[in-house]
Amino acid sequence: VRNHLLLALLNGKEYSGINNSYAHDFLKDVNNEDFRFCSIVFLIDKYAAFIESIPSKEQWLIKYSLCNIFEEACRRFGDGYGTDLALNEGIVGIVKFHKAENILAIAQNICEELQAYMKRFDCTLSCSVGTPCDNMFSVSASYSTAISNAHYRFFLGQGSVITPEAVKTIKIKQNNTLKDMDLKWSNVIASIKSCDMDAIAKSVGSSFQCLDMDKNMISFRSAYFRMISLLNSFINDYLLYKKEALNYKLDMLFERDYETIDDACSGITDFCCELSEEFRQLKGSKTNKDIFALVNKFVLKNYTDRSLTLSKIADE
């Protein structure tokens, strides 16, 4: 009943008609003028590695323990309730705190305790704080803000405490740094053709640095799609003999759900280096064939010359 009520509140459903003593106890003081309410989302970083390395039963126990630690920490400021996220990548909680308290300080304090617990499993958490509200029945708006802002972990990195104020600052700083992205992606393609791995790392890093400065997820996805399209064209133009295998890897890059921009940069860099190595081998093979054709032509023309030697062929 408790988790059912909590998820209902977070999703904006009304439970005014429930005649249940537990529900009544859970919803008491929702209009207490001395308190405010806020939803906080905690995402487990590197979640794919988390579910691969930890048995499913232990995963449930870890999240259950996180909820208990969250609620215990909240009692120092007022009260709190936690439950599993519906998408299973962490937990979500509602903290009830005195109006005199600062929600950012509360969130950081709670996050530190949860981080200390997760260190036992070599894991970290990212925390996204919603907008505080005066009524618990309005906490769905706070939850919506927390979920929306959680996407900024992609730019701010794992282990971040993401607040509405931080996101607002990011949006103010967003600008038109993407105008020259086509030129930057062209530089990436040029570095692949140069077969210089350091140049590839530098050009890809410069491109993603520009995207990181903008911190706009919509713009990032558009630019990332453009990069994938250019790499696909490169494969079709130069590496057609390996098209199927390389396109499969490219599709995986496009569909992969990266947690941070650094992960995306690393994935693109590795793939570009692989393309460059294939291109280098192709150029080497073509050069060898051209040399063989020239040698063969020269020998056929001069095979009757008794002075013909390997040195003379090489000189020619």
Task: Identify the function of each model-found stretch.
Residues 1-109, 131-154, 158-192, 199, ...:
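Interdomain helical linkers/hinges and coiled-coil/dimerization scaffolds
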Residues 69-93, 97-104, 111-136, 151-157, ...:
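Cytosolic nucleotide-binding catalytic cores of signal-transduction proteins
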